[in-house]
Structures are given as C-alpha cells and as structure tokens.
C-alpha cells in the first residue's frame, strides 16, 4: 500500500505520538494511536501502526509489538519511519545485525535522516563494525559540520582503525575551532588535548607528543598526568637528565608510588648497589614519613646489610602499630635467607618485649608500649602461617587474642590460618567472631559471608549479606541485581561441591547475564562520552569491553559450568521414581519402610521449600509490576526465568558447555585450563581433530602440566581404539602425536613423566592415575606412587593431599578403601587440624561420609 498522507488533524496527532514516545508517556501515546486508527480512512496507516507497535514494546507487550510493526511495514514498505521503527524493535531484542539491516533500508528511502544515521552509528560501534562506523560518521559530519560530536566521532573512528595521521588531523582541525583563551582552564578542552596527546603516543610520535604537552600544559587540568607523560616520553627519547628531574618531582608529590622510583633508577642509569642505596637514603631523609624509600632497599640488599636495614624498618613499624606490615614484606618471602633473618629478628623482639619491654635486653631509655608486643605476635602469626607452620601460627595469634580480645584483625587472622589449614568450618566460625566485633563493617561482613560459602554454609552466608542488602527482597536476589559476582562465583563452587548442580548452573547463567548486560550498557556511553568529552575514558572503555570475558569472575563461572555439564553428560540425572523402584527391590520390609518414611520427609521438605520460593517469586513479580506501572519506564521485556530443575536436565549438556567455552577460547587462550576443558568436551563428542588442536595448544603453554599428561594418554589410547577413522584424519593424528610422544609407547611415556617429576606430588598423582588406567593389574604400585609422603616430596600442602585422598575415593584407582584409610591417617599425623583427614564420624552408618567430607575442600585449590 502506498504511503498515505495524513491530513493536518491526524498529522498533529502523529507528532504527539512521537513526543509521547520520547517522553516515555506510553499510555497517552497509545490513546493518540487509537484516535488515528479508529478513523476508517487511516485504519491501515503504516507509520501509526508501527508507532503503536513500538509503544507496546516499551510496555513489555513484545508479541503484539512485532505484529503491529510488521503490519505497518507491509502497509507502507516505502516509509523510512516503518523501517526505522522495525530497527528499533530489533535493537531492543539485542538483534543488532538485523537492526543494522533495517536502518540501512530506512536510509535508502531517506539518506540524510540524522536520527537514523545516529542510531546506525551507535549499532556499528557497538558491533565494532569500524569501517561502517567511519562511513556513517562521515555522513553525519557532512550533514552537521558545526556539531562537535560529528568531528569527534569521525576522529575516534580513524583512531580505532589505527589511522593515527587522519585522526590527528581531524582533532587538530576541530581544536582550532574551539575558542578557549590560553590562560583559561576548561575541563572539556583539557580532555581534548590529553586525548590528542594519547593518539600521538600510540602513533609513536614521541617528540611531537612532548612538544604538544609542553605547549598546552597550562590549559590541562590533570597536572599529575602531565608530569607522568613527560617522564615516560623523556625516558623513551633518552633525555635522561630531564627525565630524572621529572621523576624526582613526582616522588616529592607522592613518595609511596613504586613506579616513580623505577623511572628514577632508569633515568639515573645506576649500575652499583651502593649508588642505588644512596639514592633511597637521600629520598628517605627528604621524606622521613614515607615507607617506600625504606622498603625498596630491602629487596636489593643481602646478608648483614639486610639484617641492619630490616631491624630499623621493623622496629619503627612495630612501635607505631602498623597492621599491614606483613603484607608490605610478603614479597620478600621468595628468599629463604631473608625469611630466616626476619624470623630471627622478630622472635628475638617477642622474647625481649615479654621480659623487659624493649626490643633488645641491652637497650635503655623509654620502654615500648604493650601494643608493640601485640603487633609482634600478630606479625609472627602471619609469618608462620605463610611458612605453613600452622601450630606455631595459632599459638601466636591465640596469645595476641588473650591480651587484646577486642581487635578485629586478630580474629580475622585466626580465621585465615584455619582456612589455610583446611578447616573451613572453624575458619567461618572465627570470621563470624571478627564480624560480631563490628557489624557495621561491610568488608568484614563480606569476608565472613565468603568464608561461610567456602564451608558450604549457603543459607548462613545469605543471612550475613542481608545486613547490607535492600529490605523487602531476598539477599540472594538483591545481590544478583547488584551484579555482586564474588558472591555468585563462591555460591557456584558451594553448590557444585554439594551436588546441587541446578542451583550452581543458575548462578553460572546469572554471571553470564551480568557480562552481557555490561557489554550492552556501552550504548549509554557512545553518545554521553562525546557530549562530555571524556574521550580517553571512552576509548579505554571500548578496549575493555572487547576483552571483558577475560575477567577472572567470568572464567570461574564458565569453568564451573563446563565441569558441571561434563558431569551431567557422564552421569545424567535419573528419574527419581525409577531409581526408587530399583533401590527398593533389594531391601527388607523394615529397610523399605524406613526408606519410604525418609523419602516422605524429604518430599514434604522439598514441597515447603518450593512453596516458599513460589511465594517469593510472586511477591517479587508484583513489586516489579507495581514499579513499572508507577514509573512507566521503558521495559526491555522479561528475561527467561532460570529454573534449576530445568538447567540440570538439559537435552544436550555438551552443547551448553560449548557456549561457555567459546569466549574462553577467544579471550583466555593463554590459560592452559581453557584448552584442557575444550579437550574434555571434544573427547566426549568424539571430535578427534578438535581434541588434537586442544592438546597441541595446551602443550605449547606448558608441556609438563599434570592434567595435560592425563589428557594426552587418554587421547592417544582413544585414537588407537578407533580403527575406523578416515585415512586423512589418521595420518594427521599420527604425525602430530609423534611430535609429542617421540616414538615412545604410552607406558614408557608415563614412566618418563614420573621420573622427571619424582618430587612433585601433583605430577606423581597424574602419572599414577595413568599407570592404573593403562594397566589395571598395577593398582598397588600406582597407589604407592600417589600416596608417597617422604621428605623428597616438595608440595605436601593441604590442597594436594586432599586431591590425592579424593582420587583414592572417586575410582581413579579402583576399589581401595583400606589404602585410603591408611593414607588418611598418615595425612592426619602430618596435618592434625585439617578437617578432611579427621576420623570420619559414624562410619558404620555412612561409609561414604569421607568422600562427601573431602569433597567439601575442593575450594582450597585456588586459595592455598
């Protein structure tokens, strides 16, 4: 149907519809749509139908919205308004490629429409179609050459395309149009100058950049950044004398910034240790309160000189009471000689302070206050905790608590020691004690919640967080709204350890949604940053968004999701009623009655929990509806509800795992775990070339990784078991695997691996697993290798020992309950406080308790 021109009355109504849409008065907009469409002459008016659909979409009525917009487009396919509206609808559904097509169709009908061009440019930068973005910004510059956003947008397009010369020409052309007096400081002009300078530095125009920053120095607001840029450029240009003066000035401004000292050392080209120490001594005299010029020499000096400097450093900090002292010195603990000196000094202080209130019994003068001994004991607790001497650490922290039972740091440290020991319940208990001393401290509250989650106390952790969340909603929901990802990743791990895979997957998908929302939130900044001239921050934002899923929170969530989906593929959840029938066949009447009673109680409990959750959901939906009705804000449509029961019973777990894997392969390719997770997925899918790709990439990162060793042997064994592979695939596999195995059979390859890593328990465990995998008759030898605890083993830490004990229980070595018990007792003697090695409670009634107990401590893998 051709475009129908509306008469003046209806035309005014249509303008009011547009105004209502812009002002978010959607109900009024629908009234005006109805007034036009109720007239039989204009009942099929395409543009009005399209606007009605767009308005309905803003009210959350998505299906009706599409129906009206498509109808409007069919009725007036030559209208740029209809195509534009259809593009806006697609954009609201995150179908950006489709939206771009709609905008392009609209521009064919009205090539100079500013609003469509602006909307198109937003989508192009969002999708990183930089070539298309440059063309669109050029059109906008031609149409609106007086608008600053036109120039800036066009320049940014060239900058992102790394055409620095053109970007600088455009920025300079625009800068010359700005009427800013030389002595006036204008923030937006200052940002423009700094952005211009950033482009110059990225183009390696160092001399021009230095001249530029010096020319406009008076008009730049951020004076500190100017000095830092000067120092960086002068160093690169080799103008070392000038650079040294700049870095000295920077140190005068902030004597605690380690980077300034590094720059000063480079500028002065100091070759000897004495010269370096002299520089630090001079700075220390100029800035007597600064810690850094006294701390950095401790990294440089050895032996007796270190003892002398460390003695002075420790005494000053203990006397004034410096809680983060150990954190300041922790980076020195790679050097065993320095650790011994620190230990000797501080233990002597403690002994002397106890007897005579001096650091040394040979001193005179003013006595140290009682708090000095407290901080010395606090330091020693941290020191011995770092060295893995947990009994001593506990002795010192208990002594400190006995003298000052109101200091939060002491209870915090005690909880930390128990965490490192592997007793997570006790750690949570002491962190709760610390939290109770100051309930208004959000940091300690969060730490307490985190420790509770590590101990699988999910409900208690939620209650702890509820002290700082909005009233009227559950803490879990509120933390999700706030994108509190540390809490969610810890919840994922806790649910995973408890076998509540549906709940864990729900949290994984929530984290995935957060990252999607963060990416989507860029839209607000594409126009805002150009308007406010925060161009450096804007370019940094775009670059951050490009690698957003490299973040540790995403990696943790994705890794857990993949592991759970692999587990669900290997052991699909069975129908409970069928499972009960199978179990009941072999039970006596008494046992059957007991089992049925237990099941009824469990069902009743589950039903009550489900009813509570349902009531909570209904209440939240009512609140959301009320909020929408009151505010009449634009709604993006309700998200699909994440139901744990559905998530853990997906039809194809491997396909779901691949969805989480793809961002990791694109952005975290330097992490070996990415490729080993990929191998595990492709191994189950039977994709041999993709398996090969994964192990090759992992091999290039770390050829001696224990998990990779297991994957290589399983892969090679699987290839040899599949004789029906296509010839070309077999040829490629044999050629590539030959490079790794170097003409060795699997047994020899495994033996070499064990010999090479005879002092590493993690490697011995993987080698022993593969020994049993290749030859079941060698069970005893494999277990003997995995359970070695002699003095030559270097990594006898809690994490690794628990890993071995779990391997003895999970079937990696077949049935070996007696060997597990022997190993548990040996580990208990080695680590008496670790929960995983304590004698299992009520073993007769529950033989699997040990497995469940040790499984709770997987969390230590990333903590110790």
From Swiss-Prot:
Any single biological process term in GO: N-terminal protein amino acid acetylation
GO CC field: cytoplasm; cytosol; extracellular exosome; NatA complex; nucleus; transcription regulator complex
Region (Disordered): 603-638
Basic and acidic residues biased stretches: 606-621
Matches recorded under SUPFAM superfamilies: TPR-like
Molecular functions per Gene Ontology: acetyltransferase activator activity; ribosome binding
Keywords, alphabetical: Repeat, TPR repeat
Mapped TPR repeat ranges: 46-79, 80-113, 148-184, 224-257, 374-407, 409-441, 485-518
Subunit structure: Component of the N-terminal acetyltransferase A (NatA) complex composed of NAA10 and NAA16.
Role description: Auxillary subunit of the N-terminal acetyltransferase A (NatA) complex which displays alpha (N-terminal) acetyltransferase activity.
Protein name: N-alpha-acetyltransferase 16, NatA auxiliary subunit
Species the sequence originates in: Homo sapiens (Human)
